Curated annotation (Swiss-Prot):
Gene3D superfamilies: 3.30.70.240, Elongation factor 4, C-terminal domain (3.30.70.2570), Elongation Factor G (Translational Gtpase), domain 3 (3.30.70.870), P-loop containing nucleotide triphosphate hydrolases (3.40.50.300), Translation factors (2.40.30.10). GTP binds at D14, H15, G16, K17, S18, T19, N131, K132, I133, D134. PANTHER family: TRANSLATION FACTOR GUF1 HOMOLOG, CHLOROPLASTIC, TRANSLATION FACTOR GUF1-RELATED. GO terms for biological process: positive regulation of translation. It is found in: Cell inner membrane. Its main location: membrane. The keyword Coiled coil does not apply. This is Elongation factor 4. Its EC number is 3.6.5.n1. It is a peripheral membrane protein. The lineage of its organism: Bacteria, Pseudomonadati, Pseudomonadota, Gammaproteobacteria, Pasteurellales. GO terms for cellular component: plasma membrane. InterPro entries: EF-4, EFG_III/V, EFG_V-like, EFTu-like_2, G_TR_CS, LepA_C_sf, LepA_CTD, LepA_IV.
Length: 598
C-alpha cells in the first residue's frame, strides 16, 4: 500500500491538465504509441469538439521510480470550468493529493484559486506545477511568486515542465512519488468503498468507479449498498489503464471500476458506500455535499411521442452527472416536458447537446431562470424556479433574488472595463486587492445577471484575460417583476421571464422586437405584447400578407373598390378571431439572446 499514490490534476481552463495527463500516460506506458492520441482522456465527442473536459476520468499507471521501486499512480483528470466544479470536488474526495497546474504564461487565475482551496479544505497535499514553459511568453519566476502571493503555497521549488514537448515530465512523476502521501486504510478491516462516479452501460448495467478506503474487494464477492441495503454479486472489476482492464481484486487504497449487474439506475448512487454483505462495515463513509442547481430551464421534446424516451434518457444522464436535477412540468404552449436544474449555462448547453446526440432526441429549451425566494402576504415562503409558478402579484409581500459572490482576477489594464460591466449588472464591490499586475476583485452580483451572459461579456471586455469564479451567497429583497409575452392577446407561458423592474421595459421591448422578426407573417395581423400584470409595456405587430383585391378593376368606380376592400377586411377579421399562431423554436431561444448584441 505504501507504493500507491492517488491524486487529481486541478487547474484553470486551458492550463494544460488533459495534455499533462497524456504525457503521464505515455511516460508510464499506459497505452502503446499506436493508441495514443491527443487528450486521450476526453473520450466524449463533445469534449473533443469543444476542447474542454466535462467528465472527470481516472487512470491507473505503474511508474518505476529512480529509487528502484514501482509505484501505482491512480490519477483523475478533472474539468476546469466553474460549471463542473462539482466533478472536481468529487474527484478530490478520492485522493490524498492534487497537482495544481498553472500556465507559466497566464499565471494564477480564478479557477486555479477556487479548486486549490477546495483541495486544501479536504486536507490534500497540493503540489504546484508550472506548465507551458516552452511558450515564448512564459515567465516561471513571476508566476511562482504569484502562486505564493495569491494562493499562499510554497512554489519556489515548483516543478517546471512543458506537457506539450514532454520536458520535465520525469520530474513531475518524481515529485508525485516524493510529495504525495500514501493512502491510509486497513486492508483487514471490513470493506468500505466510496462510489466516486457511475455511468450506465447498455450491456453491463450500472458501472461504478470506486475508491477502496478499507478492506479488499474481490471478484465474486457479495456486496451491499449501504444506503439502500440491497445486495449484489460482483461480476467484474478492474482498473482503467485508460482502457477498461479486468482484474480479480481491488486492494485497499486503489481506485477501480465495479460491475454488479445493477439494472436500476438508482441502485448505486454517487457518494454512497459499498461493503460486504456478511462482514459489513458499521459506518458509512462521508459522501459529498449535494450541490444546489443555480439555473433552471424547461426542456420539452419537440414531438410528444418522445416523452418516454426523454424521461429514460434523463434518468441515465443523471446517473452520470450527479448535479443534474429534474422534475416533470407541463406547459400549455409546449406540452409535457421536464423542469431541469443546472450548475450554469455551459452545463445546460452540454446536457442539452448530450441528450440530443447520445439519445437522439429533438428538444426545445425555455429561457433559463434562477431560483427566487418569495414571501407571501400570509407569511409563507416559497421558492420559485420558473416564471409560470410565480404567485399572483397581490399575494406577494416581497421577492428576494439570489446574490452571487464573484471573485475575479483581472490584469490592471482591463480593470476599468470590468468594473463598468459589473456596475451595469447591478453589482456591488466588496473587496479589491492588488497582487503585482493582477487585481483580485470581489463583487456581489445578482445570480440572474451572472448566469445569463456575464461570463461571455467578462471575457470579451478583457480580451479573455479576466477570469471568474462564483458561488451563491444569499437571498436579497429586490424589485422583481414578471414580464409576460402575449401573442394575439393570449399569454404564452413558455416565454415569460422574471426581471428587475428597472430593466423590464427595455427587456420587454427588445424581446417583442425579436419575436416580430422570428414569427412568420400570416394572413392576418399578429399583435405581440409584453405585459407586467395587466399593464402593457411594449407592443409590435407582425403585418399581414394581403392580396391586392383591386387588381382586376382598372379605372373603375370608387364605390366598387370600397366594397372589395370592405369585404377583404371582414374576411381578415374573421380569420383573426379563428386563426392561431405557430411559434417557431427559434422564438423560444430568442429570449436567451436578449441584451447580447449591444
Amino acid at each position: 500500500m505504501k507504493n500507491i499514490r492517488n491524486f487529481s490534476i486541478i487547474a484553470h481552463i486551458d492550463h494544460g491538465k488533459s495534455t499533462l495527463s497524456d504525457r503521464l500516460i505515455q511516460t508510464c506506458g499506459g497505452l502503446s504509441d499506436r493508441e495514443m492520441e491527443a487528450q486521450v482522456l476526453d473520450s466524449m465527442d463533445l469534449e473533443r469538439e469543444r476542447g474542454i473536459t466535462i467528465k472527470a476520468q481516472s487512470v491507473t499507471l505503474n511508474y518505476k521510480a529512480k529509487d528502484g521501486e514501482t509505484y501505482q499512480l491512480n490519477f483523475i483528470d478533472t474539468p476546469g470550468h466553474v460549471d463542473f466544479s462539482y466533478e472536481v470536488s468529487r474527484s478530490l474526495a478520492a485522493c490524498e493529493g492534487a497537482l495544481l497546474v498553472v500556465d507559466a504564461g497566464q499565471g494564477v487565475e480564478a479557477q486555479t484559486l477556487a479548486n486549490c482551496y477546495t483541495a486544501i479544505e479536504m486536507d490534500l497535499e497540493v503540489v504546484p506545477i508550472l506548465n507551458k514553459i516552452d511558450l515564448p511568453a512564459a515567465d516561471p519566476e513571476r508566476v511562482a511568486e504569484e502562486i505564493e502571493d495569491i494562493v499562499g503555497i510554497d512554489a519556489m521549488e515548483a516543478v517546471r515542465c512543458s506537457a506539450k514537448t514532454g520536458v520535465g515530465i520525469e520530474d513531475v512523476l518524481e515529485e508525485i512519488v516524493a510529495k504525495i502521501p500514501a493512502p491510509e486504510g486497513d486492508p483487514n478491516a471490513p470493506l468500505q468503498a466510496l462510489i466516486i462516479d457511475s455511468w450506465f452501460d447498455n450491456y453491463l448495467g450500472v458501472v461504478s468507479l470506486v475508491r477502496i478506503k478499507n478492506g479488499v474487494l474481490r471478484k465474486g464477492d457479495k456486496i451491499k449498498v449501504m444506503s439502500t441495503g440491497q445486495t449484489y454479486n460482483v461480476d467484474r472489476l478492474g482498473i482503467f489503464t485508460p482502457k477498461q482492464e479486468d482484474t480479480t481484486v481491488l486492494e485497499c487504497g486503489e481506485v477501480g471500476w465495479v460491475v454488479c449487474a445493477i439494472k436500476d439506475i438508482l441502485g448505486a448512487p454517487v457518494g454512497d458506500t459499498l461493503t460486504h454483505q456478511h462482514n459489513s462495515a458499521t459506518e458509512v463513509l462521508p459522501g459529498f455535499k449535494k450541490v444546489k442547481p443555480q439555473v433552471y430551464a424547461g426542456l420539452f421534446p419537440v414531438s410528444s411521442d418522445d416523452y418516454e424516451a426523454f424521461r429514460d434518457a434523463l434518468g441515465k444522464l443523471s446517473l452520470n452527472d450527479a448535479s443534474l436535477f429534474y422534475e416533470p412540468e407541463t406547459s400549455t404552449a409546449l406540452g409535457f416536458g421536464f423542469r431541469c436544474g443546472f450548475l450554469g449555462l455551459l452545463h445546460m448547453e452540454i446536457i442539452q447537446e448530450r441528450l440530443e446526440r447520445e439519445y437522439d432526441l429533438d428538444l426545445i429549451t425555455t429561457a433559463p431562470t434562477v431560483i427566487y425566494e418569495v414571501e407571501m402576504t400570509n407569511g409563507e415562503v416559497v421558492y420559485v424556479d420558473s416564471p409560470a409558478k410565480l404567485p399572483p402579484l397581490n399575494n406577494i409581500a416581497e421577492i428576494r433574488e439570489p446574490i452571487a459572490e464573484c471573485n475575479m482576477l483581472v490584469p490592471q489594464e482591463y480593470l476599468g472595463n470590468v468594473i463598468t460591466l459589473c456596475v451595469e449588472k447591478r453589482g456591488v464591490q466588496t473587496n479589491m486587492v492588488y497582487h503585482g499586475n493582477q487585481i483580485a476583485l470581489t463583487y456581489e452580483i445578482p445570480m440572474g445577471e451572472v448566469v445569463l451572459d456575464f461570463f461571455d461579456r467578462l471575457k470579451s471586455t478583457s480580451r479573455g484575460y479576466a477570469s471568474l469564479d462564483y458561488g451563491f451567497k444569499r437571498f436579497q429583497a429586490a424589485d422583481m417583476v414578471r414580464v409576460d409575452i402575449m401573442i394575439n392577446s393570449e399569454r404564452v407561458d413558455a416565454l415569460a421571464l422574471i426581471v428587475h423592474k428597472d430593466n423590464s421595459q427595455y427587456r420587454g421591448r427588445e424581446l417583442v422586437e425579436k419575436m416580430r422578426e422570428l414569427i412568420p407573417r400570416q394572413q392576418f395581423d399578429i399583435a405581440i405584447q409584453a405585459a407586467i400584470g395587466n399593464h402593457i409595456i411594449a407592443r409590435s405587430t407582425v403585418k399581414q400578407l394581403r392580396k391586392n383585391v383591386l387588381a382586376k378593376c382598372y379605372g373603375g368606380d370608387v364605390s366598387r373598390k370600397k366594397k372589395l376592400l370592405q369585404k377583404q377586411k371582414e374576411g381578415k377579421k374573421r380569420m383573426k378571431s379563428l386563426g392561431n399562431v405557430e411559434v417557431p423554436q427559434e422564438a423560444f431561444l430568442a429570449i436567451l439572446h436578449v441584451g447580447k448584441d449591444k
